[in-house]
């Protein structure tokens, strides 16, 4: 919880952030800012991000908690702001490929990028980095969590439209609390239902998942993506696990999402992460109406 003096500094700095407008789905403002220029806002994002990771059992070290790229101009912070409560609802870190050297992207440390990806995709792409929903908006139940995520996606939609973005790429994160079997099942599902069509990126140290395409074909026998997603949820329930919400969020955007290698991220307590790529033109019509219409 912010003390009054800290809150006042955050509110004051918010006036210098770039205002993208109000959410159509909740009474919150959407802003972006450069973390190096607005230190109090950046520290509040760090604080909330740290709390969010802590809730799922991930203890960030100092370098991960205070990531240098947050302040070096290579990326920007997207936040949803609850003006009535004077606090941040959630946030996303992002970097426009047209403005960023590939070696300054957060994905660079973990993946080799092909020349085709760098030349043909990156100039029209946005990299999605770490995201979070503030604890106060998680404890309000699934409704509060979903409207927070919805507002964040609305903000990303505005970035996509204003910057003429054609591709989204980033990583989905699977936390250790999921367990190895459930983690492998989720990664196998994604790589089977949303396979890579080109070798655009490859993990520097790939994670061995141990779930073959043949095995996935035997498990996921539905005729549609959603039928197979329900099969995944049923299999996860048998293990007393749930599918991470971010998986559902991404797969509901487009049927042509591509999933690449997974790897173990030691910087985040050995969480597993898998790279994904989405083509904006392939978004479902409902997604375009909800998030890309002005």
Model-derived features: where do they sit?
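Short acidic N-proximal helix/loop "leader" segments that mark the beginning
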Residues: 1-26
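Short amphipathic alpha-helix that is part of the acyltransferase structural core
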Residues: 21-96
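Short, conserved charged micro-motifs
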Residues: 40, 144, 284-288
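Acyl-donor binding region in acyl/amide transferases
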Residues: 50, 60, 97-257
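Short, well-structured beta-strand/strand-turn elements
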Residues: 56, 63, 255-265
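A short helix-loop-beta-strand connector motif used in the catalytic cores of GNAT acetyltransferases and
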Residues: 69-79, 257-258, 268-274, 286
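Long, continuous compositionally biased terminal/linker segments
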Residues: 80-81, 275-294
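Short glycine/proline-centered loop/turn elements that form peptide/ligand docking sites
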Residues: 243-246, 264-269
């Amino acid at each position: 919880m912010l003390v009054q003096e800290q809150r006042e500094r955050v509110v004051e700095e918010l006036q210098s952030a770039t205002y993208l407008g109000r959410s159509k789905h909740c009474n919150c403002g959407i802003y972006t800012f450069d973390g190096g220029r607005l230190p109090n806002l950046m520290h509040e994002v760090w604080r909330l991000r740290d709390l969010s990771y802590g809730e799922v059992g991930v203890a960030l070290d100092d370098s991960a908690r205070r990531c240098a790229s947050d302040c070096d101009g290579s990326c920007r912070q997207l936040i949803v702001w609850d003006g009535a409560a004077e606090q941040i609802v959630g946030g996303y870190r992002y970097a426009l490929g047209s403005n960023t050297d590939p070696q300054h992207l957060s994905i660079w440390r973990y993946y080799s990028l092909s020349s085709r990806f760098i030349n043909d995709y990156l100039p029209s792409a946005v990299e999605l980095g770490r995201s979070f929903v503030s604890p106060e908006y998680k404890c309000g139940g699934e409704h509060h969590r979903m409207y927070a995520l919805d507002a964040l996606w609305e903000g990303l939609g505005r970035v996509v439209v204003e910057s003429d973005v054609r591709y989204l790429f980033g990583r989905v994160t699977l936390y250790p609390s999921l367990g190895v079997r459930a983690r492998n099942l989720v990664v196998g599902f994604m790589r089977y239902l949303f396979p890579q069509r080109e070798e655009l990126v490859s993990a520097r140290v790939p994670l061995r998942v141990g779930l073959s395409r043949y095995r996935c074909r035997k498990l996921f026998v539905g005729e549609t993506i959603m039928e197979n997603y329900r099969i995944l949820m049923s299999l996860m329930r048998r293990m007393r696990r749930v599918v991470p919400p971010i998986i559902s969020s991404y797969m509901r955007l487009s049927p042509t999402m591509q999933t690449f290698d997974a790897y173990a991220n030691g910087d985040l307590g050995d969480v597993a992460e898998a790279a994904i790529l989405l083509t904006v033109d392939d978004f479902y019509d409902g997604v375009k109406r909800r998030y890309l219409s002005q």
